[in-house]
């Protein structure tokens, strides 16, 4: 009986430690998602009328999952401390929802990467063509692109030189820069999503083991 209670206490503390880590991870995920959405390249592109909204879907899901992670982390601590099977069962269900959301984010980031790259490149191509035909059209859009991606023009920057960043050292092809930057950012989002999904698996295992241990301890009593 003493060993059983000791094992139950050990599982409970493991779950408490997991929930603390999960709460901190949720805070980090929210900060990460908001930084990606409202900072740097993405912030500049979002000001454009033709900015691809689907490009942000993965980030919105990531931020939402982060907020849910923080709430669930607190919820899980309460369930572990009270040794409540009902609360632990609800905690498991919430983790399952987070797992599905994070896997969706990761898969969306990896699968939708090429589509997002082509869409942003086509936006740049259109703004570039408008500016070449008429210097009054596409001017603001090109400046936004060149500033966000720190690039200038395509094969050459001569036709769009007035819209290029003054501090830019030499010529950098925007088509190539768009592909590189978006690819890296979406891969990072995908890795974070899959990583958090992997973390939730441990939480689900701990919660089910503790729930079963609590039920068995009550049966023994």
From Swiss-Prot:
Cytoplasmic topological domain: 1-13, 76-90, 210-221
Record-annotated membrane-spanning stretches: 14-34, 55-75, 91-111, 189-209
Summary of the tissues where the protein is detected: Expression is restricted to the nervous system.
Localization: Membrane
Record: glycosylation sites: 139
Keyword Membrane assigned: yes
Annotated SUPFAM superfamilies: Tetraspanin (SSF48652)
GO BP field: astrocyte development; axon development; inflammatory response; microglia development; myelination; oligodendrocyte differentiation
Main location: membrane
Coiled coil stretches, renumbered: none
CDD domains xrefs: CD81_like_LEL
Alphabetical list of PROSITE patterns matching this protein: TM4_1
Stretches assigned to the Extracellular side: 35-54, 112-188
Bilayer topology: Multi-pass membrane protein
Family, similarity comment: Belongs to the tetraspanin (TM4SF) family.
Protein task: May play a role in signalling in oligodendrocytes in the early stages of their terminal differentiation into myelin-forming glia and may also function in stabilizing the mature sheath.
Protein name: Tetraspanin-2
